[in-house]
Amino acid sequence: MDEEEEEEMSEREVDSQVHMACVMQGRRVGIAYYDSSMHQLFVLEIWEDITEDFPLIDLVKYQSKPSTIYTSTKTDEALLLALQRNDCNDEAPAVKLMKSSTFSYEQAWHRLMYLKVAAMDEGLSVKERICFLNSMMDLGSDVQVRAAGGLLAILDNERLLDTLDQMEGGASIAIDSVAQISLDKFLKLDATAHEALQIFQVDKHPSYMGIGRAKEGFSVFGMLNKCVTPMGKHLLRTWFLRPIIDIDVINNRLNTISFFLCCEDVMSALRGTLKSVRDIPHMLKKFNSPSSFCTSSDWHAFLKCICSLLHINKIFEVGISEHLAIKLQHMNIDLVGKANSSITEELDYVSDLVVGVIDVQRGKEKGYDTLVKDGLCEELDELRMVYEELPDFLEQVSANEIASFPFSFECRKAPLIVYVHQIGYLMCFFDEKISDALLIGLPDFEFAFSEEGEERRFYYHTQKTRELDNLLGDIYHKILDMERAIIRDLVCRVCQFIPQLTKAVNFAAELDCILSLAIVARQNNYVRPILTEDSILEIQNGRHALQEMTVDTFVPNDTKIRSSGRINIITGPNYSGKSIYIKQVALVVFLAHIGSFVPADSAIVGLTDRIFCAMGSKSMTSEQSTFMIDLHQVGTMLRHATSRSLCLLDEFGKGTLTEDGIGLLGGTISHFTDYDCPPKVLLSTHLTQIFTESYLPQSEHIKCYTMSVLNPDEQTDNEDVIFLYRLVPGQALLSFGLHCAQLAGVPSEVVQRAVTVLGDIHSKRPIRRMVWEKLAAKDQQYQDAVTKLLAFDPHKGDLVNFFQEVFPS
C-alpha cells in the first residue's frame, strides 16, 4: 500500500466517529448508531436479561466501537453502568444523558419522516416515505424508532451530520443508507473470545509520546488481510467482527474463492486493478467540503479509480473463458452478472463528465493551480490568458513607467511593477527605500510595506498600479473563484450518481475481500470447509492458523464431535499443545463462518451460534481477578450455550484451592451432560483427580483425550520426555512439570529440590530440610551437644568441664 493510500486510510480512521443511542423499555433495548465514515445509520432491537450484565449490549459496543453513547436521563442505573463499561483494551465511550423527551416516540417518528436517504426519490409523500423507510428498518419496533429518531435529533442539534437541506415542515437529514442488523444472523464472539483466539491484535505506535497510528499486529485478521483497498480492509474487518450463519452466503463466498483459485491469472489482474480503487464516497465528501481544497492529484486519483472500476468488467469479459464460464454456472456463481449490475454505464458517464471539465495536467504545464479544461468557459479562458501573459505585460508597463520618472535611480536592480495575490499591483524597489527628498518629486507614490529576505524590497502604490487594480483586479483569485464555481457544479452533478458509485465501490470491496481470502488459502494450503445445518464438527489434520507460521513443523490433529462424545476432556503435560489444540478447533469454526478456507485437510463444520471462551483473560483493564473472569465466562456459558454452541475451557478451576477447582470443574461438566444434546465442549485441565474420584457422571457425551508424550520411565515425571503433540484417546496422570521447568530455564538447584520434595511426598516420608553449609555446621554442633548431654552423668560428672566442652569459648 503506497503512502497516498495509507494517508487516505488514516484520514478515514480519524474521520470515523460512531455515535450511538440506546433506549430500554422492560427487557427490550433499542439501539441506533451512526457511522460518519460510511454515512450509514444502523438500527437493531435486542432482548436483555436484566438479571445479567447486559452481554448483548457489550457485544454491540465491541462491534461498533462508539465514541459517544446517548441515552435518557431516566435510564436504569444498571444499564448506565453497562454502557460506561469498557471492553478489554478499548477506551470506554463517553456516555451523555439527554432529556427523556428527546427519545419520545412522537418526536422520534416525526424526525424519521424527514430523514433523507441517498436513494430516496424527491417529492415523496409522507405515506411513501413510510413505505420506503419500512423497507430498510422495522418501524413497528417502538424502541428502535425511539433510538433512531432520538439519535438523528441529537446529531442535528450538535451539527454532527454533514448535509442539512431545508424541506417543507423541517430539516431533512441526509445519510447514505439505513441498515437493520440482527444478532441472530451472526456467530457471536465477545471481546474475551476475540482476545483469547487472537482474532485481532492492535500494536500501539512505539513513539514515547504515543504519537502515531496503531497497526494490526500478529493476529488472524492481520494474516488473512491481503486487501489492496481501504474499503476492502474495512469490510474484511466487519466480516471478522460479524461472522455469519447464513449457509447460502457462506457457500457463495466459498464458491467464489474456489473459482479464483482455478484462474490465478484473472485473480492477479483483478488485484492489480483494485490497487487503484479508492474510497469514492470519502473522496466526494472531501470534494464537497467547503473547507478542503481539491488538487489535480485528487481528481487524477478519482478518474483512475473510475477507470479501474470499469476495467474490472473488462477483465471478467476477456479473462473468463468459455470453460471458466461453464464452471461459474456449475458453481451457481453469477459473478459477471453481479459485476455488470454493480459497475454500470453511469460510471462511464461520470468519467466523461469529469474529463470534460477537469484537465489534471494543466496545473503542471502552466505552473499554477488551475484545473478547468480550456474551451469550457470563454470568460475564464480570457482571464487565464491575461494572467499567464501578465509577467511580460507588467515588465513592459514597468519600463514605460520608469522612463516617465523625472529623475533616474542609481540602483543595482531596476524597479519593477509586480502583482501580489490578494493585495494587487505594486511598484517594487530593491535594496533601498526611496528617500523623502525624492518622494517630493513623486506625489502619486505611497509607501505600502517592506519585505526582508536575500534582498530587501520596498513596495509602493502609484497612479499606474491603482489603474491596474481597477482594470485587472485580483485576477488570480478571480480565476480561482470561477474555477471553484465550475468544479462545485461538477461535484454536484457527480454526487447525483453517489448510489451507483457506492454500489460499485462496495462490489470492489467485497471482491477485494474474496481475493484476499483466496490468496491466503493458496499460500497456506487451506481447504474448503463443508457447512452443514447439523450440529457436528469433523476436522481432519486441523492446524492452528497462527502457530503453524511460527514453527518449522506443526503436528496436525483430528477432531470428531457428533451426537455422542460432545464433551471432550483433554489432559496432558504442560507444553504439550492442549491450549493450541482447542484454539485451533475454534479458529477453524470461526474461519468457516466468515466464508474462508480453513487450515486442515478436510473439515465439516456445523453452523454455530456462539463461541464461548473461558481461557484466563489477561486484560489489565479488568478490576476482577483471572479466576473471577473465568467464573463470569463460565456462568454466561452455562446460561446461554445451546447445542449449536462451541465452548472452550482452558484450565478452569486452577485459580483457587484444588478441592474447590475440582468441584467447580466437575459440576460444570455434569451440567453439560444434563443436556439432551450438549454444546460442543473442549476442555483442557490438569485436575486429573476428577477421573480418580466420583466427580464425573457416566455419560456417552464425555470423551477423554490426552496429548501424547514419549517417556522412558512411565512411573515418574522427572525424566527427559519428548512431546509428540498428538491428540490420542486416554487420560494423562502425570504433568511432567519438572521437565517443563527445565525447558523454561528454571535453575537446576530449584528443580532438584522439587525432585526431593516429590520423592518424599510419594514415599509418605517427612519432607527433608534443604542442606546448607552454615545450617549443616549448626546441625552438627547441636548433634554433638545432644550426644554429650546424653553421655553426661549428673551424679559423678564435672559440671564445669561439661559446660566448657559444650560451649567452648
Swiss-Prot record:
MF GO annotations: ATP binding; ATP-dependent DNA damage sensor activity; double-stranded DNA binding; mismatched DNA binding
Signal peptide, first to last residue: none
Record note on disruption phenotype: Normal vegetative growth but severe reduction in fertility due to a decrease in chiasma frequency at metaphase I of meiosis.
Subcellular localization, as worded in the UniProt entry: Nucleus; Chromosome
Listed name of the protein: DNA mismatch repair protein MSH5
Biological function: Involved in meiotic recombination. Required for reciprocal recombination and proper segregation of homologous chromosomes at meiosis. Promotes homologous recombination through facilitating chiasma formation during prophase I. Involved in the control of class I crossover (interference-sensitive crossover) formation.
Principal place of residence: nucleus
Residues engaged in binding ATP: G572, P573, N574, Y575, S576, G577, K578, S579
Assigned keywords, A-Z: ATP-binding, Chromosome, DNA-binding, Meiosis, Nucleotide-binding, Nucleus
GO biological process: chiasma assembly; homologous chromosome segregation; mismatch repair; reciprocal meiotic recombination; resolution of meiotic recombination intermediates
GO cellular component annotations of the record: chromosome; nucleus
UniProt cross-references to SMART domains, sorted A to Z: MUTSac, MUTSd
Organism of derivation: Oryza sativa subsp. japonica (Rice)
InterPro entries: DNA_mismatch_repair_MutS/MSH, DNA_mismatch_repair_MutS_C, DNA_mismatch_repair_MutS_core, DNA_mismatch_repair_MutS_sf, MutS, P-loop_NTPase
Keyword Transmembrane helix in record: no
SUPFAM superfamilies: DNA repair protein MutS, domain III (SSF48334), P-loop containing nucleoside triphosphate hydrolases (SSF52540)
Family: Belongs to the DNA mismatch repair MutS family.
CDD domains noted in UniProt: ABC_MSH5_euk (cd03281)
Pfam hit, one: MutS_III
Keyword ATP-binding: yes
Annotated tissue distribution: Highly expressed in the panicles.
Superkingdom classification of source: Eukaryota
